[in-house]
Curated annotation (Swiss-Prot):
GO terms for cellular component: cytosol. It comes from the Bacteria. Residues 25-46, 73-96 bind DNA. The gene is rob. Residues 8-106 form the HTH araC/xylS-type domain. This is Right origin-binding protein.
Length: 289
């Protein structure tokens, strides 16, 4: 395997082991090289020092845990292999220009300091633009679930499918435009979990015949950044992870309070009950510029 292939596999492995012991000796043993040779090869292929990259990714993961859970700061520090809360706080402040406690309490979430996972080769930013929305009345159904940070990606994919299946269970056809409103906040019952509130909704003038038990929902107006995905519905969650993990930091955007909006345009030939379906998804994230 060529050097780029070796480092690509190593990057994938590292991403799944950031909360495990990752001394350079361990990482080199995993890759099958001497520590010195691996450090040089990693720097040649990526342009980054492997130790600094691992630390920056761990701090980025800890930043997400600070925002989305109520887990104690010391627990987060230890999970991502810092030997004390003081060591963690110093490193965190150096990368994010504020302490972990202030980062957690801020009403807004700046992407400044987040170190996206390295990708070898060209990365194509999803199509995006800045838009201003008006308040829009919808009819929808809100459901919620709790899960750990480590489970959230798989849970969101399955819950999104289940909620839409329930919502459209009696629909004769799939409506031309669907809205998913998503809000995540730390669980009040378990400090290592978050509560996710997800609203499946339609515009008021499209709801007749589709929604039997919906309630009025207001899509909040304001400034948003809109990213666009086209493909199978099974790719939506990976697209959202890319937007938050890579695109928001690359654009250095600040997320303000509010719900994420998923606006779906199913393919014209999509049928109720099909899985997966082709669609276009516009992900709108509330921002402050």
């Amino acid at each position: 395997m060529d050097q780029a292939g070796i480092i690509r596999d190593l990057l994938i492995w590292l991403e799944g082991h950031l909360d495990q012991p990752l001394s350079l000796d361990n990482v080199a043993a995993k890759a099958g090289y001497s520590k010195w040779h691996l450090q040089r090869m990693f720097k040649d292929v990526t342009g980054h020092a492997i130790g600094a990259y691992i630390r920056a990714r761990r701090l980025s993961k800890s930043a997400v845990a600070l925002r989305l859970t109520a887990r104690p700061i010391l627990d987060i520090a230890l999970q991502y292999r810092f030997d004390s809360q003081q060591t963690f706080t110093r490193a965190f402040k150096k990368q994010f220009a504020q302490t972990p406690a202030l980062y957690r309490r801020s009403p807004e979430w700046s992407a400044f300091g987040i170190r996206p996972p390295l990708r070898l080769g060209e990365f194509t930013m999803p199509e995006h633009k800045f838009v201003t929305l008006e308040d829009t009345p919808l009819i929808g159904v809100t459901q919620s679930y709790s899960c750990s940070l480590e489970q959230i990606s798989d849970f969101r994919h399955e819950m999104r499918y289940q909620f839409w299946h329930d919502f459209l269970g009696n629909a004769p056809t799939i409506p031309p435009v669907l809205y998913g409103l998503n809000e995540t906040r730390p669980s009040q019952d378990k400090d290592d979990e978050q509560e996710v509130f997800y609203t499946t909704a339609l515009a008021q003038d499209q709801a007749d015949g589709y929604v039997l038990t919906g309630h009025p929902v207001m899509l909040q107006g304001g400034e948003y950044v809109m990213f666009t995905y086209e493909g199978l519905g099974t790719g939506v969650q990976e697209f959202i992870l890319t937007v938050y993990g890579t695109c928001m930091p690359m654009l250095n955007l600040t997320r303000r309070k509010g719900q994420d909006i998923e606006r779906y345009y199913p393919a014209e030939d999509a049928k109720a009950g099909d899985r997966p379906i082709n669609l276009r998804c516009e992900l709108l994230i509330p921002i402050r510029r």
